Amino acid sequence: MQGGSSGIGYGLKYQARCISDVKADRDHTSFLTGTLSLKEENEVHLLRLSSGGSELLCEGLFSHPNEIWDLASSPFDQRIFSTVFSTGDSYGAAIWQIPEPYGQSNSSTLECVASLDAHVGKINCVLWCPSGNSDKLISMDEQNLVFWSLDSSKKSAEVLSKESAGMRHSLSGGAWNPHDVNSVAATSESSIQFWDLRTMKKNNSIERAHVRNVDYNLKREHILVSADDESGIHLWDLRKTKFPVQELPGHTHWTWAVRCNPEYEELILSVGTDSAVNLWFASASSEHKTSESPVEASRQRVNPLLNSYTDYEDSVYGLAWSSREPWIFASLSYDGRVVIESVKPFLPRR
């Protein structure tokens, strides 16, 4: 099914790849996004959906010194977020605080809370502990996981532990398990690795080539969703990982990211380099799948795609559900176009 141009758009000044839901903002539907300009001063935009839901407003515009490759908002403080950035061939990661007061009339300077300077190689991402009130975070480069404790009042971050994934694996990203704060999934060229943060050791893995992105289902404890380089999407039951419990066709080119809805367990979003955002209906349960009749199972496999949003002219890399209004999501294409959409017409009946 092809979607129309019903989304609310906002244009960034430069190219961009990352957008994050501001989970700690309980009063507004808000998103943070950052630009990726090689020659110009980069920007972080704080965007809020108007109370009537008809406009996407820039509530804050902040200068950022480097190209932003990853951005994640703190789950416990709406003014704090992390970025991974590059300057030429070198990479860095830092925690930032939005100054008060702020506005869009001119570009304000962000306050650096802490530098995550325990890396020597290319840094890929920063993950915040999903508990919402924790000061713990993880940063990953291609070879290492670093576990941090953040003290924003003292403007410092302390390394609690650091571990190498081994020379055979090149880490590319990951997701923190919302059901078990001691567990993190890390993606690599050849597998999904599961790490126990208490011991900083791998305790399990899914051997699957070229996994690009993963996300946990917030409503189903054992379900993980992965996006693969060959364009497909797979749902895994972590209690039995030999085969996926469901496969979705993904995108016509690379599937770049997948996100499970924070409230509706059957809904999954994906974005890709085919300039599309796809909304999927997935059972997300091996028990559910095996209990279906052959006709029901066949119908679900044939048409799991609820809608395809095609308001884009470039590859779509950024994707975030709103945690405050879980029927709303934001997507970001490489040309700097942010689009807000509602999936209300596709919500499952309860």
Curated annotation (Swiss-Prot):
Keywords: Abscisic acid signaling pathway, Nucleus, Repeat, Ubl conjugation pathway, WD repeat. InterPro entries: EIPR1 (IPR040323), WD40/YVTN_repeat-like_dom_sf (IPR015943), WD40_repeat_dom_sf (IPR036322), WD40_rpt (IPR001680). It comes from the Eukaryota. Pathway: Protein modification; protein ubiquitination. Its main location: nucleus. Pfam families: Beta-prop_EIPR1, WD40. It is found in: Nucleus. Disruption phenotype: Increased sensitivity to abscisic acid (ABA) and salt. WD repeats lie at residues 39-79, 118-158, 166-205, 206-246, 250-290, 311-350. GO terms for biological process: abscisic acid-activated signaling pathway; negative regulation of abscisic acid-activated signaling pathway; protein ubiquitination. GO terms for cellular component: Cul4-RING E3 ubiquitin ligase complex; nucleus. SUPFAM superfamilies: WD40 repeat-like (SSF50978). Interacts with ABI5 and DDB1A and DWA1. Component of the CUL4-RBX1-DDB1-DWA1/DWA2 E3 ubiquitin-protein ligase complex that acts as a negative regulator in abscisic acid (ABA) signaling. May function as the substrate recognition module within this complex leading to ABI5 degradation. Functionally redundant with DWA1. This is WD repeat-containing protein DWA2.
